[in-house]
From Swiss-Prot:
Chain positions of motif 'KMSKS' region: 628-632
Gene3D superfamilies: 2.20.28.290, 3.10.20.590, HUPs, Isoleucyl-tRNA Synthetase, Domain 1, Valyl/Leucyl/Isoleucyl-tRNA synthetase, editing domain
Species name: Brucella anthropi (strain ATCC 49188 / DSM 6882 / CCUG 24695 / JCM 21032 / LMG 3331 / NBRC 15819 / NCTC 12168 / Alc 37) (Ochrobactrum anthropi)
GO-annotated biological processes: leucyl-tRNA aminoacylation
Biological classification of the source: Bacteria, Pseudomonadati, Pseudomonadota, Alphaproteobacteria, Hyphomicrobiales
Amino-acid positions noted as binding ATP in the UniProt annotation, renumbered to this chain: K631
Protein name: Leucine--tRNA ligase
Similarity annotation: Belongs to the class-I aminoacyl-tRNA synthetase family.
HAMAP family, alphabetized: Leu_tRNA_synth_B (MF_00049_B)
Enzyme nomenclature, EC number: 6.1.1.4
Localization in the cell: Cytoplasm
GO cellular component, one term: cytosol
Gene from which this protein is expressed: leuS
Reaction(s) catalysed by this chain's protein: tRNA(Leu) + L-leucine + ATP = L-leucyl-tRNA(Leu) + AMP + diphosphate
Length: 877
């Protein structure tokens, strides 16, 4: 009998309600089973989820459901990364309070995520803007302050003139603010910092332990931490050109071997020598101001045009006092890195070469490839940066650069300048302390109080939390907390005098740097329950975008170590396994120069050529490139529309099936329709056979068709489990397609009433296994299929979501037959399929019975038959 068409809208709502009432996915911390913590990066509540969210959370849900089925006590929570500038922008534009805007968005997105059927423990849900959460964050801040891991200092900062706030170096991308896109300026402000540099060596060494992280992410962090071993060299200033009070410049270099190729010394615009020289030089003052118009990070400097200002000051070469080098103020030298001064060797550093060519400085090669002729070796437009042999370097000639490094270091360490060595070996890190002060309202208040008599002190713990005031105005840019009439005024906790609160709030990356720990016991009064946190952490599988490789992931690694120092956790690394999924991309469409949404067009195909037209007018539409889904280009597909049309399981299945999870997936309507057809096919096959299978006990087949279909199912159980363990979801999907294709005829035979008892038992067993394997990916369909079969697994009534992963029989997984190529006189003519354990005589006999062998021999006997066991057969005619 034909089954009714599967209705995902009805089925999915039903099973979501069942799971909620059953509290299927709530996690008990006291459960004694082995733990497994899977976490996807929690979302910012921007208003609606997008297909990228669907892919990210579908992947995490497959892992969570699979691990539950494998017997683990799984923690799979969800929350909201809810502070940040967009809420303030919305407040200014729409006259709505950030809190109201944020919680409305959370309600919408929570409903959307629930419609996906995710196996989340919603009982642990929190938003980082919840007072209960940022109260504990303020407790952590004070703990870290008391441990010496928080400091306040004046420094050059990246100022975003549009968002009117400070940005960390990591938040400046190509010289622009990561959110606003505005060109960043340098300003000098007093800021709060986390002393992440105290952990530079630890953070670097810890990367070697993260063998379940992508190598690309580890390399990005390794480069960002930027450990270098070099030499700090004192260059004597020429007394005739140097200003009063300055006798030397200290230079940090990682290439002291190239000293004889030096063409100039570059100093930072903030170097004391530059500031002194600018006192009487208006042109230099103007150049220094120009240098302050870009970000403070190395990345910002690397992308800016290289510029310099010749100060007229000279320095003497460390090995030749008659050799003078010009001193430039250079816009690519950072005061915060090394000593704020470098020497430039144009032949062996591309930046220095570009600079030297611009200012017509001498280029002298001092390293050349082995085997080259020194007299004929020169540098063109590209610096030589590889290894080789030293040239044009006096006593270093003929050495390797490594040997030359040590020779220069040894000589200068033994040379006195004044009362100390002219050089010393130093280790430097590119990593800077994390400036967390933000001049905005919608963030976690920094719990500090400023008193003219007592200085700056923490808010007493009894007075926490410092709550954000609700009565603020967003009628102009800047921080409303600075303008609040009463909130900022407070008594000093030490002397009782009038004082003021800190009005800066914390960088929102602080909020996401410890949330994974809070999820382990979000009801605790302390930031963590140490015993519970140490049980659950580290997160076993973390899933999110590679765009967070430096910012969020590095900060979280620091925060875990800082929390360990403060006694809140006992681990070093927060995330044992990291998976970075690809993006969801879509075609772009344009009509009359304007972007057009996919929902507003129709696609047609004629003679293999695709064309598009507007639904409203039929006007032609240009089909553009495939790009990341973005609102600006309107190539966005709303998950609500997909779920309403096809169901959540279809959306999940397509997101998992179309490409390897680490690669981008191209969303297509055809792909979604194909996934939906598979959903309907599975339902139809199971539902039409259900009446004949309801009361049948599952049993593995032993012969004929029953054995064939049982073997296919057992092989799939092993393979799909292996695929999920490796996060190779698309391969698991492909195997399930294969199993359905293999089992379809048997299911149809059962449905027609023509199956014997053995086949029915085998098909019941295969169907149960299929349902259990589909469940992590299409959980609603799996529950509906089991329900139509009577709601039992192995004779016991249960939910699929509470059922174990199916077992496989190793004997049925092993291939009992092998395929051996057959050659005649050394050339392959065909194949022989034979039992794996067949002896040599049996193989020879079987080969001689093959039609193509008989034809080749033409009635004659072969001279010999050579058998390489389980590999190949060669018939010599």
């Amino acid at each position: 009998m034909a089954a009714e068409r599967y209705n995902p809208r009805v089925a999915e709502a039903h099973w979501q309600k069942v799971w909620e009432e059953d509290r299927t996915f709530e996690t008990d911390n006291s459960d004694s089973r082995e733990k497994y913590y899977v976490l996807e990066m929690f979302p910012y509540p921007s208003g609606r989820i997008h297909m990228g969210h669907v892919r990210n959370y579908a992947m995490g849900d497959v892992v969570a459901r699979y691990k539950r089925a494998k017997g683990f006590n799984v923690l799979h929570p969800m929350g909201w990364d809810a502070f940040g500038m967009p809420a303030e922008n919305a407040a200014m534009q729409n006259k709505v309070h950030p809190k109201e805007w944020t919680y409305q968005n959370i309600a919408t997105m929570r409903s959307q995520l629930k419609s996906m059927g995710l196996s989340l423990d919603w009982a642990r849900e929190f938003a980082t803007c919840d007072v209960e959460y940022y109260h504990r964050q303020q407790m952590l801040f004070i703990d870290l302050f008391e441990k010496g891991l928080v400091t306040r200092k004046t420094s050059k900062v990246n100022w975003d003139p549009v968002d009117n706030t400070v940005l960390a170096n990591e938040q400046v991308v190509d010289g622009r603010g990561w959110r606003s896109g505005a060109l960043v300026e340098q300003r000098e402000l007093t800021q709060w910092f986390f002393k992440i540099t105290d952990f530079s060596e630890e953070l670097l060494a810890g990367l070697d332990t993260l063998d379940q992280w992508p190598e690309k992410v580890r390399l990005m962090q390794r480069n960002w931490i930027g450990k270098s071993e070099g030499l700090q060299v004192r260059f004597t200033l020429d007394g005739k050109t140097a200003p009063e009070g300055f006798s030397e410049v200290e230079v940090y270099t990682t290439r002291p071997d190239t000293l004889f190729g030096a063409a100039f010394v570059g100093i930072s615009a903030d170097h004391p020598l530059a500031k002194k020289l600018a006192e009487n030089n208006a042109s230099l003052t103007g150049f220094i101001e120009e240098c302050h118009q870009h970000g403070t990070s190395l990345a910002a400097l690397e992308t800016a045009e290289k510029k310099g200002f010749d100060t007229g000051v000279k320095v003497k070469h460390p090995f030749d006092e008659n050799w003078e080098l010009p001193v430039y103020v250079a816009n690519f030298v950072l005061m915060e890195y090394g000593t704020g001064a470098v020497f430039g060797c144009p032949a062996h550093d591309q930046r220095d070469l570009d600079f030297a060519n611009k200012y017509k400085l001498k280029v002298t090669p001092v390293v050349m490839p082995k085997g080259e002729d020194a007299a004929g070796f020169s540098i063109g437009e590209t610096a030589y940066t590889d290894d080789g042999v030293m040239i044009n370097s006096r006593f270093l000639d003929g050495m390797t650069p490594e040997a030359a490094f040590n020779e220069v270091a040894n000589r200068l360490e033994q040379t006195s300048l004044g009362n100390s060595p002219q050089a010393s070996r130093k280790v430097q890190f590119r990593l800077r302390d994390w400036g967390i002060s933000r001049q905005r309202y919608w963030g976690c208040p920094i719990p500090m109080i400023h008193c003219e008599s007592c200085g700056v002190n923490p808010v007493p713990r009894a007075d926490l939390p410092v709550k954000l005031p609700d009565d603020v105005e967003f009628d102009r840019p800047g921080n409303p907390l600075d303008r609040h009439a009463t909130w900022r005024h407070v008594k000093c906790p030490k002397c009782g005098a009038d004082a003021r609160r800190e009005t800066d709030t914390m960088d929102t990356f602080v909020d996401s740097s410890w949330y994974y720990a809070r999820f382990t016991a979000p009801w605790e009064n302390e930031p963590t329950d140490r015993k519970v946190a140490d049980h659950w952490l580290p997160v076993d599988q973390y899933i999110g975008g590679i765009e967070h490789a430096i910012l969020h992931l590095l900060y979280s690694r620091f925060f875990t170590r800082a929390m360990k120092v403060a006694g809140h956790v006992g681990i070093d690394e927060p995330f044992k396994g990291l998976f970075t999924q690809g993006m969801v991309v879509h075609e772009t469409y344009k009509a009359n120069g304007q972007w057009v949404a996919p929902a507003d067009i129709r696609i047609e195909e004629t003679d293999g050529k695709r064309s598009a037209a507007l639904l409203s007018t039929g006007e032609p539409v240009e089909i553009g490139s495939i790009e990341k889904m973005s609102k600006s280009k309107k190539n966005v597909v709303d998950p609500d529309d997909i779920i309403a049309s096809y169901g959540a399981d279809t959306a999940r299945w397509f997101m998992l099936s179309d490409s390897p999870p680490e690669r981008d997936v191209i969303w297509t309507e055809a792909g979604a329709e194909g996934a939906h057809r598979f959903v309907q096919r599975v339902w139809r096959l199971v539902a039409e056979a259900a009446e004949h299978l309801k009361d049948v006990a599952p049993k593995t087949g032993t012969q004929g068709e029953a054995l064939v279909v049982s073997k296919a199912a057992h092989k799939a159980v092993k393979a799909v489990g292996d695929d999920i363990e490796k996060l190779a979801f698309n391969r698991g999907v492909a195997r399930l397609y294969e199993l359905v294709n293999t089992a379809a005829a048997s299911l149809q035979q059962v449905a027609s009433g023509n199956a014997d008892d053995e086949l029915k038992s085998a098909v019941r067993d295969v169907t149960e296994k299929l349902i259990l394997m589909l469940a992590p990916m299409m959980p609603h369909l799996a529950e509906q299929c089991l329900a139509v079969l009577g709601g039992k697994i192995a004779g016991r009534e249960t939910l699929v979501a509470r059922s174990a992963w199916p077992e496989f029989d190793p004997a049925l997984v092993v291939e009992n037959e092998i395929v051996m190529p057959v050659q005649i006189n050394g050339k392959k003519r065909g194949d022989l399929t034979i039992a794996r354990d067949a002896d040599q005589a049996s193989i020879q006999q079987a080969v001689l019975e093959l039609d193509f062998v008989k034809a080749a021999l033409n009635g004659s006997s072969p001279k010999k038959v050579i058998v390489v066991p389980q590999r190949i057969v060669n018939v010599v005619a």
